[in-house]
Swiss-Prot record:
Family: Belongs to the class-II aminoacyl-tRNA synthetase family. HisZ subfamily.
Organism for this UniProt entry: Desulfitobacterium hafniense (strain Y51)
Localization in the cell: Cytoplasm
One GO cellular component term: cytoplasm
Keywords: Amino-acid biosynthesis, Cytoplasm, Histidine biosynthesis
Protein name: ATP phosphoribosyltransferase regulatory subunit
HAMAP family: HisZ
Pathway: Amino-acid biosynthesis; L-histidine biosynthesis; L-histidine from 5-phospho-alpha-D-ribose 1-diphosphate: step 1/9
Miscellaneous: This function is generally fulfilled by the C-terminal part of HisG, which is missing in some bacteria such as this one.
Task performed by this protein: Required for the first step of histidine biosynthesis. May allow the feedback regulation of ATP phosphoribosyltransferase activity by histidine.
Superkingdom of the organism of origin: Bacteria
Length: 383
């Protein structure tokens, strides 16, 4: 039965991968996973579908999930990320495992997005059971090393701390309603909207000054001194010192030059509690790496454990890379006797070559023409 026009398309935001594209993705994914393994991270996998009771969104995230019902009427969700799924798995299947626990993954995730892409290939890590600044620095350094290994392009890592934002808001005493609007615009880097919002509320001069400077406060470690001029509140001082320590450890890891401190980073998921970071590459208008500390999440699953991690949007990086022909056949085998063609192809494959065999009898001229069309450099006649 002929397909309708809808049957010839794919759902909005989903994608096919052609051979060259898939080869490039698999190569990048393997490079990342090999690196994670070298840092003692073990690969895990979770179901594509989770119960909605596991993936509990905050209000602003709920509409971004793909939902359906099973035959018992339970709400199911296509996983929008792996962090929560891994928290469920660790808290149930791996309870009692010695901490710190280092896990990694490669998987597709699904969520509605303003970029019109709804299916994302991710690689990432979770470091569970350590509250130290060294753990925060480790995952940032590992994200940087992964980008260096798989991307082959310039990138920038921005590092911040959720406690600095909440501490400044508490010091200024701004209304909760204003804070939510301000936070939303800050996360979008909507500087014009921030200026209009601050002026509309008519705060005193000192408060306005801090609120307008905060979005532009980024750079190296000395930038943190400006924050301490605004307040010495204990919670704020603790957050500043924690961020400062992470940044210094990154120098020990040899990756500090890739990192800029940015106090305007506010992660989109509600569970981030400490150091947070984002990574950008040229040509992509959103972060290709997102991560940070989420110490409260495991408590929701009955396992009180601090944790940190990151995810790399592999699809976004692949789109900026040039597809290679690395996975295309190297040899085309032809001949008049199919049995001999099969035997010759088997022999060549045993040497490690990628071999395509002609399924019909071809002349040498026809075989050469076919190889040229397919980009195959070597042609062998089976005799």
């Amino acid at each position: 039965m002929p397909r309708s026009s809808l049957g010839l398309r794919i759902p909005e935001g989903m994608h096919d991968l052609l051979p060259d594209e898939l080869a490039l993705q698999e190569q990048a994914e393997t490079s990342a996973l090999d690196l994670f393994k070298a840092w003692a991270y073990q690969k895990v996998a979770t179901p594509t579908l989770e119960y909605g009771a596991c993936i509990q969104p905050v209000e602003e995230e709920g509409d971004s999930f793909f939902k359906l019902f099973d035959r018992q009427g339970h709400v199911l969700v296509l996983r929008p990320e792996l962090t929560t799924s891994i928290a469920r798995m660790v808290s149930t299947r791996m309870r009692g495992t010695a901490f710190p626990l280092r896990l990694c993954y490669a998987a597709d995730v699904f969520r509605y997005s303003k970029s019109h892409k709804q299916e994302f290939r991710q690689v990432g890590v979770e470091l569970i059971g350590s509250a130290s600044s060294a753990a925060d620095a480790e995952v940032v350094a590992l994200a940087i090393e992964a980008l260096r290994k798989i991307g082959g392009m310039d990138f920038q890592i921005n590092l911040g701390h959720m406690g600095i934002f909440t501490g400044i808001m508490a010091e200024l005493g701004v209304p909760q309603e204003f804070q939510l609007h301000y936070q939303e615009k800050l996360a979008r880097k909507d500087f014009v909207g921030i200026e209009r919002l601050v002026k509309d509320y008519g705060f005193e001069t000192r408060v306005q000054d801090v609120l307008l400077k905060l979005p532009h406060l980024h750079g190296k470690e000395d930038m943190l001194d400006q924050v301490l001029e605004w307040s010495r509140r204990p919670s704020l001082l603790e957050a500043v010192n924690a961020l400062r320590q992470v940044y210094r450890y990154l120098k020990d890891f040899g990756v500090q030059d890739y990192v800029s401190l940015d106090l305007g980073i506010l992660r989109g998921f509600s569970y981030y509690t400490g150091a947070v970071f984002e990574g950008y590459v040229p040509g992509v208008g959103f972060p290709v790496v997102e991560g940070g500390r989420y110490d409260a999440l495991y408590g929701d699953f009955g396992e009180d454990a601090p944790a940190t991690g990151f995810a790399i949007n592999l699809k976004a990086i692949i789109e900026q890379m040039v597809c290679s022909n690395a996975e295309r056949p190297e040899v085309l085998v032809y001949g008049s006797d199919v049995s001999k063609v099969i035997a010759e192809a088997r022999k060549l494959r045993q040497t490690g070559k990628r071999v395509e065999m002609c399924l019909e009898s071809l002349t040498q001229e026809q075989a050469m023409e076919s190889a040229e069309c397919k980009g195959i450099k070597e042609v062998v006649c089976a005799r």
